[in-house]
């Protein structure tokens, strides 16, 4: 699930880091974990600048730390709702009626706003995140949800160069549906406050779309006054060859909110100034993240820069994709739809039983792969994955596929 930055053991590198060394030998810092929302350490802002803010996405000047991907997205949704209502009120204080009705879960204090999400999405397992998740039924079953719009995510045909016209038509169809849903939900009295999307739908089957699709979707959000939330919980951290997958879109103004977790060691979300909560405690929980993780992240980022690991990912990713294409050509009755960015790659099998069999045999040979979607194998190596690792992977996979002839 793309949660590892580096898989090599680097205890000496980490433990000798001066800031981390001071932290490790300070028992008080371990035992008395600070409630960051009200009592952050004096140096906490400095540590944010050294870690999370040093890799902030384009246009993002603020970061809110959290603990995990779900609470990152859940609170990002809340930020978008608060921002939307503040706009509607003209940034005036809430009325007495709004304050009273919110206590009994009624409008106008609890407004009928919505978040637009996409089929195949996965954003988390808390209530709001589940309402925007449409890929794994087991997580949603028996849980009440919200009446929020769900748009189709493009289903691209591969190889891309052979289906340029068809894929452009498919993306146009999905974008048209997005606009129709925004208008429809506004007419229903449930206006769309925000749009949330993954740069690559991971759990849903490693589904991709073109930079043009995301650019036009960003414009639709702006046109209709919706916040645009890019969920980089799985794709962030460099595995696509860029630190943030949305950088591949080439946009100067890619998002209003970018959420993260997994590889970043801590959770949270970046946001524009205008999405800053207008009052204390509106975005709040007990811990609001963990300052120790910022120390670890700071050193991890130093290693990434020093060893040019994003360049390594680009080289290894190219070799991996080429190798998967070759296997697909050799075993067309088993494999199809090779795709990926960097080492964030995937390939489809002929059915789920075959996929599961291949993965089991691979695991028994020392190769651990993931599954997603209906019949997809996904590859999520760490950033230290080198070309010789690629060849080892491909050799093991080739041996297994030969047994399926």
List PLM regions with ranges.
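Conserved N-terminal phosphate-binding loop of PLP-dependent enzymes in the Aspartate aminotransferase
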Residues: 1-405
């Amino acid at each position: 699930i793309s949660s590892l930055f580096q898989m090599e053991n680097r205890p000496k590198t980490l433990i000798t880091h001066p800031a981390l060394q001071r932290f490790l030998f300070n028992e008080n810092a371990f035992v008395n974990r600070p409630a960051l929302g009200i009592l952050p350490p004096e140096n906490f802002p400095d540590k944010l600048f050294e870690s999370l803010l040093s890799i902030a996405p384009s246009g993002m000047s603020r970061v809110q730390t959290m603990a995990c991907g779900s609470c990152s997205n859940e609170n990002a949704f809340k930020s978008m709702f608060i921002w939307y209502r503040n706009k509607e009120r003209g940034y005036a204080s809430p009325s007495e009626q709004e304050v009273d009705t919110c206590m009994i879960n009624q409008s106008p204090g609890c407004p009928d706003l919505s978040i637009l999400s996409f089929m195949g999405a996965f954003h988390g397992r808390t209530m709001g995140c589940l309402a925007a998740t449409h890929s794994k039924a087991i997580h949603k079953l028996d849980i009440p949800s919200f009446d929020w719009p769900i748009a189709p995510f493009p289903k691209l045909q591969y190889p891309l160069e052979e289906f340029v016209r068809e894929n452009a038509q498919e993306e146009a169809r999905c974008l048209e549906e997005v606009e129709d849903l925004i208008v429809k939900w506004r007419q229903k009295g449930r206006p769309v406050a925000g749009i949330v999307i993954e740069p690559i739908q991971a759990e849903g089957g490693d589904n991709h779309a073109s930079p043009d699709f995301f650019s036009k979707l960003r414009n639709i959000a702006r046109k209709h006054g919706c916040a645009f939330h890019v969920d980089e919980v799985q794709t962030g951290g460099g595995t696509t060859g860029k630190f943030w997958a949305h950088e591949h879109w080439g946009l100067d103004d890619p998002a209003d909110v970018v959420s993260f977790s997994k590889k970043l060691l801590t959770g949270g979300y970046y946001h524009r100034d205008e999405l800053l909560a207008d009052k204390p405690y509106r975005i709040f929980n007990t811990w609001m993240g963990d300052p120790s993780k910022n120390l670890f992240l700071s050193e991890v980022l130093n290693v990434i820069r020093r060893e040019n690991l994003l360049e390594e990912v680009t080289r290894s990713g190219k070799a991996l994709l080429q190798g998967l294409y070759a296997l697909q050509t050799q075993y067309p009755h088993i494999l199809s739809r090779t795709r990926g960015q960097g080492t964030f790659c995937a390939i489809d099998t002929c059915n789920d039983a075959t996929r599961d069999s291949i993965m089991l045999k691979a695991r028994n040979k020392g190769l651990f792969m993931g599954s997603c979607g209906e019949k997809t194998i996904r590859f999520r190596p760490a950033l230290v994955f080198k070309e010789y690792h690629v060849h080892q992977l491909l050799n093991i996979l080739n041996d297994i596929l030969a047994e399926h002839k």
